[in-house]
Amino acid sequence: MTNIRKTHPLMKIVNNAFIDLPAPSNISSWWNFGSLLGICLILQILTGLFLAMHYTSDTTTAFSSVTHICRDVNYGWIIRYMHANGASMFFICLFMHVGRGLYYGSYTFLETWNVGVILLFATMATAFMGYVLPWGQMSFWGATVITNLLSAIPYIGTNLVEWIWGGFSVDKATLTRFFAFHFILPFIIAALAMVHLLFLHETGSNNPTGITSDTDKIPFHPYYTIKDILGALLLILVLMLLVLFAPDLLGDPDNYTPANPLNTPPHIKPEWYFLFAYAILRSIPNKLGGVLALVLSILILVLVPALHMSKQRSMMFRPISQCIFWILVADLLTLTWIGGQPVEHPYIIIGQLASIMYFLLILVLMPVASVIENNFLKW
């Protein structure tokens, strides 16, 4: 008799995706981040659901409802901090996952990669709107500054901003709609993640060498299920260390002050995971130019497959490309640091140089290095 997991319509899907899936025998720990992102998403949806049971999306009560969650709701504080720091863990996993894709040439799976870029945009939008909900000073001013950027769009800009705000400033209508969008988007992300997985399973996983692994496949279960469980335990360990010992380490103290439209904080900055893009935005003196650079800093990922000039897929055997990749990582860390600094000398010039370097590395130096490496191999 055939096993039920291979015949039942629903279990068959699960079986083909997580149990009998043929996987390369040599995929490293860099391949753990996909499953970790899934765990992060489930965790965020669950903690978010329980927070939504006690949160009120009204300008007069939003801040105090978050205080109520932390003070009066049973284990409300841990749910709130797991949600806030869970977002940080989510983005750490996202950046590692994208970095892995860049390093090992996984972007040659075009559909999987493009759905991944859409997922990145959706996650960034969700995180931004979630940051507005506690209605602290940085929530309010962050929302005001970032939504205001759309006014740089010629002709329709001002109307677009007022349409998003639901009025002439960030107010009750804005908060309510941001809560609605923040609630629905994670489910859209979950659906997109399934599409992402669907496209991936059409081709099978890449591996560190970038060479086809059809000759040496192993079943996903038990080999990679146990490996994913180890990754999950480490993820939860780091998350709980953050939540229980330093819950406000990655947050902004200004967000413990209720939103006040009459008082602008001295330094408006987003959460740490947006700082690199914020630094690129600020490095251009022109408003529209800054907005375009901000969007392109993420959208550039779509161009990466077209810029792949190497005859090898992975960077495993390409030392020059490896050097450029790690310079890019250092450049992104520099941008993250600059994004959190005030707009003054020498931070302005460092930010501008790091922004130029970012686009130069991806658009020029990586393809050039690939061509040089091809010539070395007499290909």
Curated annotation (Swiss-Prot):
User: What is the species listed in this Swiss-Prot or TrEMBL entry?
Assistant: Oryx leucoryx (Arabian oryx)
The protein's name in its UniProt record:
Cytochrome b
Note the CDD domains from the entry: cytochrome_b_C, Cytochrome_b_N
Q: What does the entry list as the binding residues for heme b b566?
A: 97, 196
Q: Which residues cross the membrane?
A: 33-53, 77-98, 113-133, 178-198, 226-246, 288-308, 320-340, 347-367
The entry's free-text remark on the cofactor is: Binds 2 heme b groups non-covalently.
The entry assigns this protein to a family as follows: Belongs to the cytochrome b family.
Which processes are annotated in GO (biological process)?
A: mitochondrial electron transport, ubiquinol to cytochrome c
Sites where the protein binds a ubiquinone: 201
Compartment list: Mitochondrion inner membrane
Q: What is its main location?
A: mitochondrion
Miscellaneous comment? Heme 1 (or BL or b562) is low-potential and absorbs at about 562 nm, and heme 2 (or BH or b566) is high-potential and absorbs at about 566 nm.
Q: How does it assemble?
A: The cytochrome bc1 complex contains 11 subunits: 3 respiratory subunits (MT-CYB, CYC1 and UQCRFS1), 2 core proteins (UQCRC1 and UQCRC2) and 6 low-molecular weight proteins (UQCRH/QCR6, UQCRB/QCR7, UQCRQ/QCR8, UQCR10/QCR9, UQCR11/QCR10 and a cleavage product of UQCRFS1). This cytochrome bc1 complex then forms a dimer.
Cross-referenced SUPFAM superfamilies, in alphabetical order? a domain/subunit of cytochrome bc1 complex (Ubiquinol-cytochrome c reductase) (SSF81648), Transmembrane di-heme cytochromes (SSF81342)
What GO terms fall under cellular component here? Answer: mitochondrial inner membrane; respiratory chain complex III
Residues binding heme b b562 are 83, 182
The role this protein plays is:
Component of the ubiquinol-cytochrome c reductase complex (complex III or cytochrome b-c1 complex) that is part of the mitochondrial respiratory chain. The b-c1 complex mediates electron transfer from ubiquinol to cytochrome c. Contributes to the generation of a proton gradient across the mitochondrial membrane that is then used for ATP synthesis.
Q: Name one GO molecular function term.
A: metal ion binding
Protein topology in the membrane: Multi-pass membrane protein
Name of encoding gene? MT-CYB
Q: Which Pfam families match?
A: Cytochrom_B_C, Cytochrome_B
Q: Which Gene3D superfamilies does this UniProt record tie to the protein?
A: Cytochrome Bc1 Complex, Chain C
Q: Which keywords does UniProt give here?
A: Electron transport, Heme, Iron, Membrane, Metal-binding, Mitochondrion, Mitochondrion inner membrane, Respiratory chain, Transmembrane, Transmembrane helix, Transport, Ubiquinone
**Which co-factor is required?**
heme b
